[in-house]
Amino acid sequence: MEYFDMRKMSVNLWRNAAGETREICTFPPAKRDFYWRASITSIAANGEFSLFPGMERIVTLLEGGEMFLESADRFNHTLKPLQPFSFAADLVVKAKLTAGQMSMDFNIMTRLDVCKAKVRIAERTFTTFGSRGGVVFVINGAWQLGDKLLTTDQGACWFDGRHTLRLLQPQGKLLFSEINWLAGHSPDQVQ
């Protein structure tokens, strides 16, 4: 289990100066050719998403104005707060910020031939489904994960096991992404 606080994470500026990335975790850890990766990005200007051939991307708007996503004849989609949207990461996708507002997004990418991610918003206590990896990010409220208290802009990532996240207040929201491995693949094969 790895815990993080977004406010204390290192920031990588994009080469085109249109945004920045805070990498939460990758699997396998510290590998350039990852099977899955979770990050938080801040987008300050209109532009194109980076291409990642063979990957699926799920983007969830956390803060800021809505973002319009366009991929030639494939799709036109307005990204709204806390509504995950998935697309092939090898498509050219243009992002246009509405009203010029900066946006902050949660991104998870998975290798299409190895694993699949699901992203949900939780508003009550729950137990993960025993996946072989996952990430949680607290949007608001106070949540208990094992012996650790997580509050706004904090989270955790893990590579195996079931975990219970307990909401400690009457209301709260967290983003939860679970990684499931496709038949014939296992995280044990790559470590």
Swiss-Prot record:
CDD domains: cupin_HutD_N (cd20293). Signal peptide: none annotated. It comes from the Bacteria. Belongs to the Ves family. NCBIfam families: PRK11396.1. PANTHER family: PROTEIN VES. This is Protein Ves. It comes from Escherichia coli O1:K1 / APEC.
